[in-house]
């Protein structure tokens, strides 16, 4: 089967935003205008196509990234049909993992901001993730029809809060209830959409007289930004020559693709204005798969030899599995992005990460949660496979005869955990299956069992994250569970270096004995660095034979899981083995493992051990009247207020607060502010816990 749409006419984009910026509504409008959806789904009616889990419709927030495909030929049918693959990503910080995954497989993104709220905390998180993967983006300032809407203030915030270079492509005509359309700053015409047909048709009009000067000013700003794309254009511009529309567009496209500027559009998705022009901007300025650099990877040859794949059907097949979802009808759905080559349903491919072969049973293209079966997918496509057995998020799938491991995604460590048990003994096994299935879907969700108490522990990125997963277990797997009190994921480390710590394990009383003897140094590593643990072998002259060195490393590593101070994982530590002794007959791996763990425990407790606690970045929006109460409460929670910003509706307070002090904060904040304040929080870093706090935690752990 030949390719139906040339790859140059593909756009793989994500739609990303803060909660309530109107992202799902924007996606719905895109589906409507591109002709996929005949009745527009409204989030507040709980019918939006992209929000397909029951819980999402109840809570009105997007939890999983639904992927869907649409075609667009332009507002005035000025383009050949382009294929737009859209990934709708959640805006809540507890689901950052979903955003991270989708950013990894996108070529471009549309950042949706609320014209009233502007750039909010989650917007900054999403921005950092887009920077990490070098994703070119454009912005859409939504909700221009709302009270307090201010387009230019949002443009200014993109500059100051995100340290970006925003360049408006449009300015709004009117605002709040007087918002009627936009001025196209390239054509220098106003666009008015037809309300009778929900904005499908539009007319160009003259720019209203009161906007003429402002439009002129921003038009010049746009032309100057375009001219900076090349010396030739700059010379032309400085020489007073007019730049043609084609020159302006191609120059702006180049600068967007180079991540030098962010083009800003505006509108009101709810009122059917502006989304159409934003879609045109997606086609004109965001990259096709062929515009982005070749995807990097390594060969699975044990030497990590660098390799790459270009977006072409001619190259060997390679794809990245970026999401696993459980479907009630077909079991596991594996969403994947094809970077090169072609794959057909029925083909067998390799998962080089696990060195296993996988067969593509069926391939489906998703439109939110409706699926359409297809025979093949090619470079640039995003689809889902049914029938893959052992693939987890971030795995590569590739041609058997041309293996490559594509760059993996990095997932955050969980910061909160709770104990969970089924309500009935009969559900024990069902709960185990359900939790493992959920952990396979979501790499930031971990399941483990507490060795001492035998309890099952689940860990994740926040209270909401765990609530949603427990809720899904109830609905999808019909398992009722009791959930314990949230526990904080503390860590242990040392503050000082300690040298020449000895560990000796000797049992020699007739017969085969045990003998292991090690001398190690322990030193702290920089906090939050690349590695949590480093082992250095500096043994000379064979005082410990080579075959026992891994056992020493292993003995220390086993101690890291449960630290000597209070049984929490140990981080940021370097161990150096430099001396020891052995016995020809009695030495064994197990003896060296025990000796190493003894030395580690003793050394750790002498090297000024400390407890680390997770610190959260918290942002609170509150009316001014409640400022004093909110700040007073943050101080009581050991919070550190970093700064404040003005909002049309009050203030934004930015603070750092230990996670341990934030449980139940949503309820407390509601009662302090009569429900008028809102907050968001995300993990920031680990800090040393104050000694009185650490002491209480250590004693509580010992009492267990």
Curated annotation (Swiss-Prot):
Domain tr-type G: start-end pairs: 8-290
Disulfide linkage: none
Pfam name, any one: EFG_C
Binding of GTP, residues: 17-24, 88-92, 142-145
Primary location recorded for the protein, binned into one broad class: cytoplasm
UniProt cross-references to SUPFAM superfamilies, sorted A to Z: EF-G C-terminal domain-like (SSF54980), P-loop containing nucleoside triphosphate hydrolases (SSF52540), Ribosomal protein S5 domain 2-like (SSF54211), Translation proteins (SSF50447)
Entry keyword Cytoplasm: yes
InterPro entries: EFG_II, EFG_III, EFG_III/V, EFG_IV, EFG_V, EFG_V-like, EFTu-like_2, G_TR_CS
Summary of the function given for this chain in its UniProt record: Catalyzes the GTP-dependent ribosomal translocation step during translation elongation. During this step, the ribosome changes from the pre-translocational (PRE) to the post-translocational (POST) state as the newly formed A-site-bound peptidyl-tRNA and P-site-bound deacylated tRNA move to the P and E sites, respectively. Catalyzes the coordinated movement of the two tRNA molecules, the mRNA and conformational changes in the ribosome.
Protein name: Elongation factor G
Organism of this sequence: Proteus mirabilis (strain HI4320)
Name of the gene encoding the protein in the UniProt record: fusA
